[in-house]
């Protein structure tokens, strides 16, 4: 793992030694933060089949509506992204994270304005403990990185996968618009697809899974997130005050509602709190694609959609810009609280 305030990369033998011993204090969480790691319910995250999305669109929209309103998350199968593309992006993430340390070192940065960033985790600088993972971030749209600036290990896989994600994202925003009772192009016309960045996580095996987390409890500062996880598991969501496993489903993609969409829908859709547990087995790989321009320049002002408001349903949030929201979100860190509360009227 990358050590705080130091650009130091351990050899594979050193990493293996660390994984076989114990969790360093910098990653340790207090016991009360980890006393509920086992699922506390038998709930199951909704699974929606997109195979008939064009023939039975209304039925799919109703399922998305129910999931977005009650869960804030759902899994999609038969979504149109080839299995070979899903496998290749996962393989590409592994190839990069298991590259020679000197190769990865050249990409290490804490500068969020760079188009490709390799880092341990930003929580080390804003929270009391770090998370047990390595990650890289890449901005793919609207101003994609020069392919030559991307690591060879994952370059083609990232470019290919992001094209499929943009296509699926377009369909999802149409269906979500219809689920709100609006024209299908409403969310796209409001700029919800203006930005896409990809965060690729590598969770090494953890010698003491009861001592730390892979990712702390948080919601996403996005419109929506499209997540691909491998078969190891560990992702949990908070539903009705219970932690629920998001069980791996081969070939499926996970869609979760982000903070921006909860605000814009005036709480009609909910942004889901989630976290990732550590595991003695690994590495665990996940690829999260965020529809959000994040810290990139964007002066668009967002707020509750006027067509959804009425005397009985007045605005619950004040307006915001994405850079403004993202700055506060990052400064706050993954402390288990929602940044949405700062915008509630």
UniProtKB/Swiss-Prot annotation:
Q: Which residues does Fe cation bind?
A: 218, 220, 274
Please list the residue ranges annotated as the Fe2OG dioxygenase domain: 194-293
What's an example GO BP annotation here?
biosynthetic process
Q: Which InterPro entries match?
A: DIOX_N, IPNS-like_FE2OG_OXY, IPNS-like_sf, Oxoglu/Fe-dep_dioxygenase_dom
Q: Where is this cross-link: Glycyl lysine isopeptide (Lys-Gly) (interchain with G-Cter in ubiquitin)?
A: 16
Q: How is the cofactor bound?
A: Binds 1 Fe(2+) ion per subunit.
**Alphabetically ordered keywords of this record:** Iron, Isopeptide bond, Metal-binding, Oxidoreductase, Ubl conjugation
EC number(s) for this protein? 1.14.-.-
- Annotated GO MF terms: dioxygenase activity; metal ion binding
Q: What SUPFAM superfamilies does this protein's entry cite?
A: Clavaminate synthase-like
Record keywords: Metal-binding included? yes
Keyword Metal-binding: yes or no?
yes
Q: Which cofactor does it need?
A: Fe(2+)
This protein's source sits in the domain of life called Eukaryota
Residues recorded as binding 2-oxoglutarate, renumbered to this chain, are: 284
Q: Give the family from UniProt.
A: Belongs to the iron/ascorbate-dependent oxidoreductase family.
Query: Which protein are we looking at?
Result: 1-aminocyclopropane-1-carboxylate oxidase homolog 7
């Amino acid at each position: 793992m990358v050590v705080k305030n130091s650009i130091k990369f351990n050899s594979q033998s050193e990493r293996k030694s660390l994984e076989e011993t114990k969790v360093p204090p910098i990653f340790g969480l207090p016991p009360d933060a980890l006393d509920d790691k086992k699922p506390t319910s038998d709930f199951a995250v909704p699974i929606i089949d997109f195979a008939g999305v064009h023939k039975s669109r209304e039925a799919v929209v109703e399922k998305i509506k129910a999931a977005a309103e009650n869960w804030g998350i759902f899994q999609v199968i038969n979504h149109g992204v080839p299995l070979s593309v899903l496998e290749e992006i996962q393989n590409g993430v592994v190839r990069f994270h298991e590259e020679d340390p000197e190769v990865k070192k050249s990409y290490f940065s804490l500068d969020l304005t760079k188009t490709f960033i390799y880092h341990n985790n930003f929580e080390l600088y804003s929270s009391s403990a770090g998370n047990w993972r390595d990650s890289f971030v890449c901005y793919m749209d609207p101003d994609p990185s020069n392919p030559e600036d991307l690591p060879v290990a994952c370059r083609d896989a990232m470019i290919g996968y992001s094209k499929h994600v943009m296509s699926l994202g377009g369909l999802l925003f149409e269906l979500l618009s219809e689920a709100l009772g609006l024209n299908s192009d409403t969310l796209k016309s409001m700029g919800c697809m203006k930005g896409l960045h990809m965060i690729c996580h590598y969770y090494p095996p953890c010698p003491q899974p009861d001592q730390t987390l892979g990712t702390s409890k948080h919601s996403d500062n996005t419109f929506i997130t499209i997540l691909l996880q491998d078969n190891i598991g560990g992702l949990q969501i908070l539903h009705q005050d219970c932690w629920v496993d998001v069980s791996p489903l081969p070939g499926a993609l996970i869609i979760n509602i982000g903070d921006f969409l909860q605000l814009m829908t005036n709480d009609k859709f909910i942004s889901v709190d989630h976290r990732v547990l550590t595991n003695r087995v690994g590495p665990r790989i996940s690829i999260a694609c965020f529809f959000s321009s994040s810290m990139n320049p964007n002066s668009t002002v967002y707020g509750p959609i006027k067509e959804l408001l009425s005397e009985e349903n007045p605005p619950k949030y004040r307006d915001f810009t994405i850079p403004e929201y993202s700055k506060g979100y990052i400064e706050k860190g993954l402390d288990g609280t929602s940044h949405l509360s700062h915008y509630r009227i």
